[in-house]
Amino acid sequence: GLAESIRAADSIHPIATHHMGGQAMAFPNDPNIRVFGQQTTKNTPEAMHDDAGKQGWGNWVYVMAEAHPWHKDLIDAELNNAAGRAPMRRSQWATAMAGGYVMMYDAFESGDPTDAMFDDLRRLKLFMEGTPFNRMAPLFDDALTTAKLDGTKYVLSNPAQGLYILYGDVNTGKLGVRNAPVGNYSLRWFDPVTGVTVNQSGSVVAGGLASFTKPAGVGPEA
């Protein structure tokens, strides 16, 4: 096939696919294609994380390339009445917490995203780059419901290594997770809206309930 021919001529660069027919990877068994740029028609952060995330996840790099027309509508809403930034940011975090990379779709059109929207995406990028996210996996469905505690909405985790990224989107007073290994933890609180970071320490005792109160200075998203 085409990907095989490209790989024969270029052994270095990753080969990606982006297709408009369906959200699931169309070439899951092609060893030459290792990047999937997904296009979805979902229009809520929850659906982006759940359905789009589960279909995008696999033995390849997962990139949320388009959420059309929702993301375009959010850009227009932000430009018209400052109503699109928050749902766009939550959508991007939902994708990241599903194991995906994020593109700012429609950035090349006449109605460009605002600087604040780009700043939100950069904060997400910098946060993830400061974590070992590549050693964690997203939780979905019953596994997510069983694990999350307090204001936690999405979870990336590697319990065997005691690694967790927890995200809460609205009025987050605490973040927590069940069945965490007993021990002492380094906590890094992060505000996706402002970039404020607070470092703390915490511990988990027998029973595995890890529940931590959000510190002052971090807003309702954390």
Task: Say what each PLM segment does.
Residues 1-116:
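Extracellular glycoside hydrolase catalytic/binding regions
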Residues 61, 70-73, 84-202, 209-222:
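Aromatic- and carboxylate-lined catalytic core of secreted/periplasmic carbohydrate-active enzymes
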